[in-house]
């Protein structure tokens, strides 16, 4: 080979080598490639989305009362054998699916397993094992959004979408890089909580009484002076952490019976008593033969038992249907219906934005022009339907001296860090329905029902 060719080859090799060196220098000094390389070796795991809690009227939490645990699992750590006993059925199935994975993952475990050498993170457990006011509060869907009850109605307030994240430097096999530790990055903002009118202690006590005394039903406890609901219980209950099991369960446990409409019956009779006292008909007396006949239709008292000569007090104590039918005829349909409407019958109650109780059925004036329909209406039968919330509002009006206070369940949003009140979510509303003297007489009459009449089982 001639010297000129050797020189040309040598020059070409030198030029190529120089190009490679320049390229390597450029790559080393380019931070964008470094960032990409680091990102390819980082695993980011998202913890459950942050969500504001519900609090009672004194600031005590109603949700988030306990915590659950997430175990951080890396390939090659023996997670399957170590964590299997500490996972529920779904977690055990996931361990099996992920046994040959090449990426880290978070696993729900029943307790803190850091003693096994596994990194473990505490997260709030939304609902307690014995949940509070579950039908009122509701439950979440699989994405952490409210699906029912106040959880759904106030989802825009409670859900932020912000999540804490775990950043793990991993190898190509998904294992934690030697000398590194996972970094927990907190969400930028904390969610707002919501303060309810409920009292946690009263709610818990009411749920205990309900569990001992009924399989199906509800309990409402209202602050007489304000209309604020201190307890709202509906049975049967359900597990808000496992709603699927309750979808087909007997007794419709997802139904909030306090907000659902039912046939009313004799608890409607105080409405007629109030109308009678306001109209000056409180001294009406009737001889009860155990029934009342109207246009060939017989309306019987319970067991067709004659009550004899009864006034308003005896008719309430004995729950005399015939007395109230005749009292209603004396008053007229318009007066009785007007009193019922003023006490909240036939109108739904806004619990929160997007959550409303049933309106029930208050028969139209034209319907009550029919004597048979009006007779049934006078002792709480016929087309009349009402919610326990409406009945509780009526009874509270009697206790509050004739003033109707709209029942309230929600108070305001709160700062979860300081407890400071932020934005009011409801406003109280009151109106006088009947005179204070009427309310005092009704209180006396209803006390007699408990002491001497059909309500003796309600005596303290």
Language-model segments: what does each one mean?
Residues 61-63, 181, 223-266, 271-460:
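Beta-lactam-recognizing serine transpeptidase/beta-lactamase-like catalytic domain environment
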Residues 1-244, 337-342, 458-459:
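Periplasmic/cell-envelope proteins involved in peptidoglycan metabolism and beta-lactam response
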């Amino acid at each position: 080979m001639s010297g000129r060719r050797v020189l040309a080859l040598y020059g070409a090799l030198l030029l190529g080598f120089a190009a490679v060196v320049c390229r390597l220098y450029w790559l080393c000094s380019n931070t964008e490639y470094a960032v990409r390389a680091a990102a390819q070796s980082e695993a980011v795991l998202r913890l459950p989305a942050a969500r504001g809690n519900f609090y009672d009227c004194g600031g005590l939490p109603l949700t988030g009362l306990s915590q659950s645990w997430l175990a951080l699992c890396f390939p090659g750590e023996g997670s399957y054998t170590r964590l299997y006993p500490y996972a529920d059925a779904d977690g055990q199935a996931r361990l099996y699916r992920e046994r040959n994975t090449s990426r880290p993952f978070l696993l729900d475990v029943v307790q803190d397993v850091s003693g096994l050498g596994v990194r473990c993170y505490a997260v709030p457990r939304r609902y307690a094992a014995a949940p509070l006011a579950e039908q009122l509060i509701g439950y979440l869907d699989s994405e952490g959004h409210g699906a029912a009850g106040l959880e759904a109605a106030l989802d825009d307030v409670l859900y932020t979408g912000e999540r804490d994240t775990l950043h793990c430097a991993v190898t190509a096999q998904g294992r934690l890089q030697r000398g590194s530790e996972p970094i927990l990055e907190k969400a930028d903002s904390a969610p707002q909580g919501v303060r309810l009118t409920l009292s946690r202690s009263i709610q818990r006590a009411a749920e205990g009484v309900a569990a001992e005394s009924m399989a199906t039903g509800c309990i409402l406890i209202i602050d007489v002076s304000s209309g604020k609901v201190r307890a709202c219980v509906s049975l049967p209950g359900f597990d808000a952490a496992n709603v699927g099991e309750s979808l087909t369960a007997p007794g419709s446990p997802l139904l909030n019976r306090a907000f659902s409409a039912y046939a009313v019956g004799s608890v409607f009779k105080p409405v007629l008593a109030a109308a009678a006292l306001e109209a000056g008909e409180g001294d009406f007396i009737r001889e009860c033969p155990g029934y009342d006949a109207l246009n060939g239709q017989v309306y019987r008292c319970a067991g067709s038992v004659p009550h004899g000569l009864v006034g308003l007090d005896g008719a309430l104590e004995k729950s005399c249907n015939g007395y109230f039918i005749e009292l209603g005829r004396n008053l007229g349909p318009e007066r009785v219906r007007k009193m019922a409407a003023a006490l909240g019958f036939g109108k739904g109650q806004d619990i929160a934005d997007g959550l409303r109780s049933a309106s029930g059925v208050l028969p139209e004036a034209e319907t009550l022009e029919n004597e048979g329909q009006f007779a049934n209406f006078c002792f709480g039968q016929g087309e009349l339907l009402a919610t326990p919330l409406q009945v509780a509002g009526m009874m509270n009006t009697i206790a509050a001296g004739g003033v109707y206070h709209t029942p309230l369940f929600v108070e305001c949003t709160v700062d979860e860090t300081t407890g400071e009140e932020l934005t009011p979510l409801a406003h109280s509303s009151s109106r006088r329905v009947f005179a204070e003297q009427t309310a005092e007489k009704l209180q006396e009459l209803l006390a007699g029902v408990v002491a001497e009449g059909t309500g003796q089982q309600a005596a303290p």
